[in-house]
């Protein structure tokens, strides 16, 4: 379908182009459409060096937000290079003990629950997740009616307007995709195994 077509930006190669659409659509939905991020907002991104998280950092910075990112020790430098203003090593630091509160918390991993995040959200803050459990999906909207600090789940679908916006952001060097490794088609099992193990930055690409 036409709405599902992603036209390759002219300033990047095909491998990088393949790594961008899905994660950028998800990050765009979370930060621009749901959170309506604005200049000066304080944003926390859990999993800031993964596929969605790495693009989310760049989108948030392009909007003028102050970005804190959570990642592992090995990826601290990568997170800084993405533009994160503050980087938290989850292996040695506890974000819940930091003396700072956020306008938006984006959890792309699934291990920073809304019940935990409430203590570091501002009074009108918003928690957004791309990795909610089924119970959260079923009961979250009902519970939110009674809460000032709302929690939202990202439900994503392609559309040509957003893809066009993302293409422009890439061409204006506001966001870039990061390819951790490119696999040949015959190495699909190896790619799947690495995907299941995790621990890499950005995305894996399968070359047809």
Regions found by a protein language model. Name each.
Residues 1-208:
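Terminal helix/beta-alpha structural elements that buttress the NAD(P)+-binding lobe
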């Amino acid at each position: 379908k036409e709405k599902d077509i992603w036209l390759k930006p002219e300033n990047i190669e095909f491998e990088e182009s393949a790594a961008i659409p899905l994660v950028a659509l998800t990050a765009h939905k979370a930060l621009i459409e749901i959170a309506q991020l604005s200049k000066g907002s304080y944003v926390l991104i859990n999993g800031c060096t993964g596929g969605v998280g790495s693009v989310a950092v760049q989108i948030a910075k392009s909007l003028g937000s102050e970005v804190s990112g959570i990642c592992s020790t090995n990826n601290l430098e990568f997170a800084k290079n993405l533009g994160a203003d503050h980087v938290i090593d989850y292996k040695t630091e506890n974000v819940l003990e930091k003396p700072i509160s956020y306008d938006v918390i984006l959890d792309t991993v699934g291990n920073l629950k809304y019940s935990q995040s409430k203590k570091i959200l501002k009074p009108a803050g918003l928690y957004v997740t791309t990795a909610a459990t089924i119970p959260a999906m079923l009961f979250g909207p009902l519970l939110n009616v009674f809460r000032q600090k709302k929690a939202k789940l990202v439900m994503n679908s392609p559309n040509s307007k957003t893809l066009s916006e993302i293409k422009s952001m890439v061409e204006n060097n506001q966001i870039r995709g990061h390819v951790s490794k490119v696999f040949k088609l015959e190495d699909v099992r190896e790619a799947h195994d690495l995907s299941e193990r995790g621990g890499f930055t950005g995305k894996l690409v399968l070359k047809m």
